[in-house]
Amino acid sequence: MAEEMESSLEASFSSSGAVSGASGFLPPARSRIFKIIVIGDSNVGKTCLTYRFCAGRFPDRTEATIGVDFRERAVEIDGERIKIQLWDTAGQERFRKSMVQHYYRNVHAVVFVYDMTNMASFHSLPSWIEECKQHLLASDIPRILVGNKCDLRSAIQVPTDLAQKFADTHSMPLFETSAKNPNDNDHVEAIFMTLAHKLKSHKPLMLSQPPDNGIILKPEPKPAMTCWC
């Protein structure tokens, strides 16, 4: 399913730019899409981060991601309208095996996420980096490191200097933020828009026609669970 969906995204035109002319409707304007994958352990807040950027708010509730899900947002940069797709997968291996090869296809950037209140999620980062290497992502693909839940100051387990050292070792910028409280440290909006500006300057044209609501794949309804920022 993911393969068919992705093929259709890359092979079609955006429907938002059609205009009428003397001979009827002109071909719709082309728009570029950028696929950014968001990876990390379960419960680090990946879904909440993507929801914050695409919907502009913290979700009232969320469900455990099963398989792959993505959200999309159109933004304008230097007069050009582009689409940012944030792909989010389950952090649990049993939900990832059947989808992972599709998840890494045609990736433009990677966001590694850890929970600042959970040292184990930070220690898992090398395994996520290794997974990227195994799927042959080009070395020039932008990568950033995001520590989430910085608003929970009394529960912080991962100090900034430790995270910064790790980021420097892997040539990644570090951001510390909170999907729940956007006023804490690096704003989620600024993080993804900074990445979008960088991608716009370097990546080739890709054509797309995903639905405007942006949420394409969703798990079957399950009881609500806490997003934990």
UniProtKB/Swiss-Prot annotation:
Matching SMART domains: RAB (SM00175), RAN (SM00176), RAS (SM00173), RHO (SM00174)
GO-annotated cellular components: Golgi lumen; Golgi membrane; phagophore assembly site membrane
Gene3D superfamilies listed in its UniProt record: P-loop containing nucleotide triphosphate hydrolases
UniProt-annotated binding residues for Mg(2+): 47, 65, 88
Major place of residence: Golgi
Motif (Switch 2): 89-108
Cell compartments where the protein resides: Golgi apparatus membrane; Golgi apparatus, cis-Golgi network; Preautophagosomal structure membrane
Lipid-carrying residues in chain (S-geranylgeranyl cysteine): 227, 229
Motif window: Switch 1: 56-68
Family affiliation: Belongs to the small GTPase superfamily. Rab family.
Protein name: Ras-related protein Rab-33B
Species name: Pongo abelii (Sumatran orangutan)
Gene symbol of the encoding locus: RAB33B
